[in-house]
């Protein structure tokens, strides 16, 4: 096998592995995947425009320039693509009632060897310490946005996550096997929404707002097992805000998905440690 063929096979395997890992975190968000694929292609093209990768059969810098341009076009197209509106036809959960319309979403689940009641208790007790990558991702976000990092006290490792959301103006509700939290912010006014109930959060339509709702549900899977799922939904209440949120969401959703995976892992450890 030639070096060129081996290099392309290795590069393809790495790309496939990256895409699978990326989508494991990001719940198969196509536009986010395409945006990051465009970024990777642009960086690869830039490198080839400087020094062509001859081991891949690329011998001219112009090829790198073409790859760079194609990557930029793909990235921009994925980031500015209009977000579709999803509507719940027949509400089945408290989350459906709190957020029946949304443009952005992610969902994750895990099996836990514990009863649903133990799982929901573990959800309530989960802390920021469960999110191992939170500090690193916040530093990256702050550097990218050129804003101060979140105060360490607000995100202390032993602080309960749901308590922090409540302190930020989010409202919670639900039932025995479902917890729903809803809130958000008015972007132009730079203030939190602070709804007084899930119903008020659902009906809020003031322009410039971004509403966020997420839930945890636990279902009996038999033989002492449960399936816990968490879904996040986001609604921007006008077109301008939706376009901005679309760009932001497609860039941050891999990190968001990673944190939710870690959150679920912490819930699993806590629930399975109960007698």
Predicted features, each with a name:
Residues 55, 77-171:
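Hydrophobic ligand-binding cavity/cleft-lining segments
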Residues 12-52:
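Membrane-embedded alpha-helical segments of integral membrane proteins
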Residues 1-12:
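N-terminal membrane topogenic signal
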Residues 65-79:
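Hydrophobic membrane-insertion alpha-helices, especially the h-region
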Residues 62, 199-255, 267:
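Beta-strand/loop substructures that line and gate deep hydrophobic ligand-binding cavities in soluble
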């Amino acid at each position: 096998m030639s070096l060129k063929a081996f290099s392309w096979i290795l590069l393809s395997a790495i790309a496939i592995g990256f895409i699978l890992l990326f989508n494991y975190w990001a719940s198969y968000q196509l536009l986010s995947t395409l945006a990051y694929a465009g970024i990777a292609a642009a960086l690869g093209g830039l490198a080839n425009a400087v020094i062509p990768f001859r081991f891949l059969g690329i011998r001219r810098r112009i090829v790198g320039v073409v790859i760079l341009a194609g990557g930029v076009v793909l990235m921009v197209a994925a980031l500015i693509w209009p977000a579709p509106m999803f509507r719940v036809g027949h509400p089945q959960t408290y989350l459906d009632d709190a957020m029946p319309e949304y443009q952005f979403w992610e969902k994750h689940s895990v099996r836990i060897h514990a009863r649903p009641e133990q799982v929901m208790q573990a959800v309530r007790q989960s802390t920021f310490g469960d999110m191992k990558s939170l500090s690193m991702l916040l530093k990256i976000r702050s550097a990218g946005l050129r804003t101060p990092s979140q105060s360490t006290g607000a995100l202390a490792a032993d602080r309960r996550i749901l308590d922090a959301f409540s302190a930020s103006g989010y409202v919670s509700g639900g039932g025995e096997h479902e917890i729903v939290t809803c809130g958000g912010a008015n972007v132009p006014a730079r203030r939190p929404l602070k709804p007084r109930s899930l119903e008020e959060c659902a009906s809020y339509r003031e322009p410039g707002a971004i509403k966020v709702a997420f839930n945890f549900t636990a279902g009996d899977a038999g033989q002492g097992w449960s399936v816990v799922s968490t879904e996040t939904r986001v609604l921007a209440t006008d077109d301008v805000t939706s376009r901005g949120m679309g760009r932001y969401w497609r860039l941050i959703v891999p990190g968001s998905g990673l944190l939710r995976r870690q959150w679920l892992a912490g819930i699993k450890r806590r629930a399975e440690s109960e007698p």
